[in-house]
């Protein structure tokens, strides 16, 4: 579980995140939307312990991040926008190295290879140097790490940017599997197709504040865009009307936050 309680961060007196209250339970994929500078990446950095909050608190499972960021990061697998691996090591060797940083037991190479292929890395790439890996292949190593360490949380920052449609589908399937495994998944993205594919809930951020949380159940890309535009486009559409299971129209379940 990921929990933020009145979490705030300012830089030079300018608020980047303002009193965020958020809970992402185990097994949920939660997607954060918003323009650049809205506070999305700041939120990830505070959960990861890469930055210290100005006030409030972030928790990963029961671990309070600020006093013990290393313990918190042991619970997390993190997919940044640009995954960096050791280029001279193979995918299997990279996985063994990073796993060894967070736990004493590292499975044998055969088990690591299985985890990598389960995460979607082509079998022929498992024992090749990572210098020849594409962005999507590097991401698969981190997703295998999430499985190997049984991470309680998976954080992703714009993971689909620069990927071709096939790689996006593969990545979304892997993220969905992590949620099904029981990880709390928090993904920052502008990719509405990915959001429609995997999110259980959506959060919209604006100027450091979480201004809306909506259920993603049954929402299309167009529905999500309409929801987003209500906060940023003065001429945006009204709340979309979506067909219910019985054919009647139904608006998306949502919480307006102010």
Q: What kind of region is each of these model predictions?
A:
Residues 56-67, 72:
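Conserved ABC transporter NBD signature motif
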Residues 96, 100, 109-125:
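Conserved ABC ATPase "signature" region
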Residues 154-157:
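Catalytic Walker B motif of ABC-type/P-loop ATPase nucleotide-binding domains
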Residues 165-167:
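Helix N-cap at the start of a conserved alpha-helix in ABC-type nucleotide-binding domains
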Residues 189-190:
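H-loop/switch region of ABC-family ATPase nucleotide-binding domains
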Residues 195-197:
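A short, surface-exposed alpha-helical micro-motif characterized by mixed small hydrophobic
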